[in-house]
């Protein structure tokens, strides 16, 4: 069988509400999720031996490959699919790590899609979906990599029709551990982060066919509840947010996930590209991407 390849697109949390912490210690979330046009690329060379080789500009940041989520997802699927055909993976790493954009989760989801193709399985086969869920909280949403409202601990996905949103994404190349941000949030097991009245309110999102302006206005009404605790963990997040907010033509700036990646939305591609150029000149050490979310 010839080699198979998949993109592993960056995940962006346009909004992220922490509803509360469950008695089992996990956090219940509600998030509007989009996907960017920047990505890692994962290639599978089908064969008898499972392996993973790293390449690309971000390879040195990934550390030991033995506990990489690509291999974890593969092993979990192999436990559920007899005689699963695997092989050698090559990960061309471009997205920053520990960055709040689901890079490792997107890679794992890409691995599951590749394995599904190599074994003539549907990507929504229950065994594939279960392997995604057990690999990590962000892997289920990255499996289809389509805009949605994500709830629970990441397992409940409600599709959205999201227009193309011109955007700039910035990471200061400072890793932020998700567990540290949730620790800074400081919720006890069983504690709600929102009031009961707010919990009962259903957030209304624009209907299918709504414009980018409608969506930006709706997203503005939301928040990222992890922004404040992330600032306690790593103050450079504030520098990134201020730099994005100061760009000409910016409509919204916010942190994605648990950080440190932040994004800004614009009315058009020209403003986004111009903003990215300004940031690259002012902060040559930062990772900056201009493109679109969808």
Curated annotation (Swiss-Prot):
Organism expressing this protein natively: Rhodopseudomonas palustris (strain BisB5)
Binding site for ATP: 96-106
Pathway, per record: Isoprenoid biosynthesis; isopentenyl diphosphate biosynthesis via DXP pathway; isopentenyl diphosphate from 1-deoxy-D-xylulose 5-phosphate: step 3/6
HAMAP family to which the protein is assigned, alphabetical: IspE
Homology family: Belongs to the GHMP kinase family. IspE subfamily.
Active-site feature positions: 11, 138
GO biological process terms, semicolon-separated: isopentenyl diphosphate biosynthetic process, methylerythritol 4-phosphate pathway; terpenoid biosynthetic process
Reactions accelerated catalytically: 4-CDP-2-C-methyl-D-erythritol + ATP = 4-CDP-2-C-methyl-D-erythritol 2-phosphate + ADP + H(+)
Protein name: 4-diphosphocytidyl-2-C-methyl-D-erythritol kinase
């Amino acid at each position: 069988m010839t080699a198979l390849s998949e993109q592993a697109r960056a995940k962006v949390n346009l909004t992220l509400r922490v509803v509360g912490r469950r008695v089992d210690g996990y956090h219940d979330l509600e998030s509007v999720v989009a996907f960017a046009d920047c990505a890692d690329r994962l290639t599978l060379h089908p064969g008898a031996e499972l392996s993973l080789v790293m390449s690309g500009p971000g390879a040195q940041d990934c550390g030991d490959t033995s506990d990489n989520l690509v291999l974890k997802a593969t092993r979990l699927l192999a436990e559920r699919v007899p005689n699963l055909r695997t092989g050698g993976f090559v990960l061309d790493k471009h997205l920053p790590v520990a960055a709040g954009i689901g890079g490792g989760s997107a890679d794992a989801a890409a691995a599951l899609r590749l394995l599904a193709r190599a074994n003539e399985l549907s990507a929504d086969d229950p065994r594939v979906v279960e392997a995604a869920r057990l690999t990590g909280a962000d892997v289920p949403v990255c499996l289809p990599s389509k805009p949605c409202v994500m709830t629970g601990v990441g397992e409940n996905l409600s599709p959205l029709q999201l227009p193309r949103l011109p955007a700039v994404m910035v990471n200061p190349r400072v890793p932020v551990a998700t567990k540290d941000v949730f620790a800074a949030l400081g919720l006890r097991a069983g504690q709600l982060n929102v009031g009961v009245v707010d919990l009962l309110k259903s957030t209304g999102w624009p209907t299918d066919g709504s414009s980018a302006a409608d969506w930006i206005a709706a997203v503005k009404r939301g928040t990222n509840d992890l922004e404040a605790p992330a600032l306690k963990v790593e103050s450079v997040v504030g520098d990134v947010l201020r730099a994005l907010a100061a760009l000409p033509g910016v409509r919204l700036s916010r942190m994605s996930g648990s950080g440190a990646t932040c994004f800004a939305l614009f009315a058009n591609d020209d403003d986004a590209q111009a903003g990215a150029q300004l940031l690259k000149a002012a902060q040559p050490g930062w990772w900056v991407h201009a493109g679109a979310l969808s």
